[in-house]
């Protein structure tokens, strides 16, 4: 019996019936280092697979959103968050006939450059790096996939397609954009990225707002009574109670969050379809020249803004979270300063890479790549008298 079969040389039919304004793998702007095409996967599938197998992606399991990793087993990490973003984005992409593989790749990679300890860690590292160009996690995510991953013999990084790299770089200063060639041009010329990149950005917002509600309630740092002041919560909590009168507690919370996520997704799809109908893009170049087309309606945008404000005031600024953030900032600041004062304390591979001019940036790379637990242990090893 002959089990061999012929595969197509360019498997772009695997993408299905995409809209003309979607990003098509056959029309990719390519990779920095030329590679032969796969006979079994599209270019964006290859990007997704490379991201999943990267060291930086595995480390996301031990990097936090809001809570320090060891504070609770049920709290979300950067890894679970990235998976949730990818699921939301991929579902919306299918409804809009966008490229599911590209939107998944961008979603999975968008947090690869995040520091340990969430935003507190990023703010601390940025403060340390201000004399040396600053630190920004979106640009760091790009550096991870372009340079810092070491998986291939022929090049540094993952050698991802232009479209995936573009989606990872959500924000960029004009100064940094000027150094990035074609990738930075849209920030200088006021153009938009692909619809897939726009979608991944808003799916990130949908995921973290709603899942921070969940984690905040689990931790006891916010209460159901407080949430009643948030219209988006109150409306869908009442709907959930009306639909399931016998349900209460954790199940009612889950049902309410599910309904909020669904409402946001339905609104986003409807608003985006209306924008596409109005501007009628016929190709991805038309998308780049149009205003942002993936969007919430104004009423939903306002409701989401109120929710974000609530989380900022009641969760992210809760005194226990602020204590964790203060500890995180101290750890990051201490590590950066001790490595700057004596680079011999760095692991050998970072000493070898770190000439005097590049030393601050490589120290930032080292710290940004740490997990929460590793950063705590490294701090203890260096500063605790009884540690070895």
Curated annotation (Swiss-Prot):
SMART domains in UniProt: HDc (SM00471)
GO biological process, one term: dGTP catabolic process
Keyword match Membrane: no
All copies of domain HD, residue ranges: 78-209
PROSITE patterns reported for this sequence: HD (PS51831)
SUPFAM superfamilies with a match to the protein in the record: HD-domain/PDEase-like
Pfam families tied to this protein: HD, HD_assoc
Superkingdom of the source species: Bacteria
Key words, A-Z: Hydrolase
Region of interest: Disordered: 24-44
MF term (GO), any: dGTPase activity
NCBIfam families: dGTP_triPase, PRK01286.1-1
Entries under PANTHER family matching the protein: DEOXYGUANOSINETRIPHOSPHATE TRIPHOSPHOHYDROLASE-LIKE PROTEIN, DEOXYNUCLEOSIDE TRIPHOSPHATE TRIPHOSPHOHYDROLASE
Protein family (similarity comment): Belongs to the dGTPase family. Type 2 subfamily.
Name recorded for this polypeptide: Deoxyguanosinetriphosphate triphosphohydrolase-like protein
Upper lineage: Bacteria, Pseudomonadati, Pseudomonadota, Betaproteobacteria, Burkholderiales
């Amino acid at each position: 019996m002959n089990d061999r079969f012929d595969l197509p040389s360019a498997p772009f039919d695997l993408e299905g019936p995409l809209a003309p304004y979607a990003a098509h793998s056959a029309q990719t702007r390519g990779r920095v280092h030329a590679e032969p095409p796969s006979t079994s996967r599209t270019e964006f599938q290859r990007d997704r697979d490379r991201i999943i197998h990267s060291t930086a992606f595995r480390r996301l399991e031990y990097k936090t959103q809001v809570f320090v990793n060891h504070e609770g087993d049920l709290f979300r990490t950067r890894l679970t968050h990235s998976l949730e973003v990818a699921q939301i984005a991929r579902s919306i992409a299918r409804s809009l006939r966008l490229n599911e593989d590209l939107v998944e790749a961008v979603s999975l990679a968008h947090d690869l450059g995040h520091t340990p300890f969430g935003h507190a860690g990023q703010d601390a590292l940025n403060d340390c790096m201000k004399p040396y160009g600053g630190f920004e996690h979106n640009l760091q995510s790009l550096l991870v996939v372009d340079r810092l991953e070491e998986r291939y013999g022929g090049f540094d990084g993952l050698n991802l397609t232009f479209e995936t790299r573009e989606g990872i770089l959500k924000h960029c200063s004009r100064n940094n954009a000027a150094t990035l060639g074609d990738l930075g041009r849209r920030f200088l010329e006021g153009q938009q990225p692909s619809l897939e990149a726009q979608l991944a950005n808003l799916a990130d917002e949908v995921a973290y707002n709603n899942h921070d509600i969940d984690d905040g309630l689990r931790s006891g740092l916010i209460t159901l009574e407080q949430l009643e002041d948030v219209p988006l919560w109150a409306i869908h909590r009442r709907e959930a109670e009306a639909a399931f009168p016998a349900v209460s507690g954790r199940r009612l919370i889950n049902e309410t969050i599910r309904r909020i996520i669904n409402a946001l997704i339905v609104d986003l799809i409807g608003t985006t379809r209306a924008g596409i109908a109005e501007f009628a893009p016929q190709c991805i170049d038309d998308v780049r020249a149009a205003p942002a087309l993936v969007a919430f309606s104004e009423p939903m945008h306002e409701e989401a803004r109120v929710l974000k404000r609530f989380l900022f005031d009641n969760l992210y600024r809760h005194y226990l979270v602020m204590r964790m953030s203060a500890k995180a900032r101290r750890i990051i600041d201490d590590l950066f300063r001790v490595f700057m004062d004596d680079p011999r304390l760095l692991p050998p591979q970072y000493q070898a890479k770190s000439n005097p001019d590049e030393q601050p940036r490589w120290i930032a790379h080292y710290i940004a790549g740490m997990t929460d637990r590793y950063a705590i242990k490294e701090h203890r090893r260096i500063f605790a008298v009884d540690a070895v």
